[in-house]
């Protein structure tokens, strides 16, 4: 079976991309165990707890990321450079345990996947 990478690169709640990506990720996990999740660029904001999406009339789907371990999704990576550029500390308690990687290491890891879906 092909290895599938899900890349979250957009901020939450501005569009439906993050919610749709999470739905696709959970659905795909029923079909294969060989997948990983990458958070890059503004997608690192998907990892922050304490968001208030109801203030902008959006659905609170961020807490659903906590279910990844129940779906046996354990390969989660976050771009360390994206965190720094946005003033976030890699030690911040995120809703998902994601391993920080520098951009070059992240690209190498991403190159190991056959299919890359970006949200």
Curated annotation (Swiss-Prot):
Coiled-coil blocks: none
Predominant cellular place of this UniProt entry's protein: cytoplasm
Transmembrane segments: none
Keyword check for Metal-binding: no
GO-annotated biological processes: tRNA processing
Keywords of the record: Cytoplasm, tRNA processing
GO CC annotation terms, alphabetical: cytoplasm
Localization in the cell: Cytoplasm
Purpose of the protein: Part of a sulfur-relay system required for 2-thiolation of 5-methylaminomethyl-2-thiouridine (mnm(5)s(2)U) at tRNA wobble positions.
Binding partners and assembly: Heterohexamer, formed by a dimer of trimers. The hexameric TusBCD complex contains 2 copies each of TusB, TusC and TusD. The TusBCD complex interacts with TusE.
UniProt similarity note: Belongs to the DsrF/TusC family.
Protein name (record): Protein TusC
Organism: Shigella flexneri
Lineage: Bacteria, Pseudomonadati, Pseudomonadota, Gammaproteobacteria, Enterobacterales
Gene name of the record: tusC
């Amino acid at each position: 079976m092909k290895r599938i990478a899900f890349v979250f690169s957009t901020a939450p709640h501005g569009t439906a991309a993050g919610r749709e990506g999470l739905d696709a990720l959970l659905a795909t996990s029923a079909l294969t165990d060989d997948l990983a999740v990458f958070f890059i660029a503004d997608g690192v904001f998907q990892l922050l707890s304490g968001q208030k999406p109801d203030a902008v009339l959006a659905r609170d789907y961020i807490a659903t990321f906590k279910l990844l371990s129940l779906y046996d999704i354990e390969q989660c990576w976050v771009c360390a450079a994206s965190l720094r550029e946005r003033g976030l500390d890699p030690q911040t308690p995120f809703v998902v345990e994601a391993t920080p990687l520098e951009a070059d290491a992240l690209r190498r890891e991403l190159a190991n996947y056959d299919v890359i879906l970006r949200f």
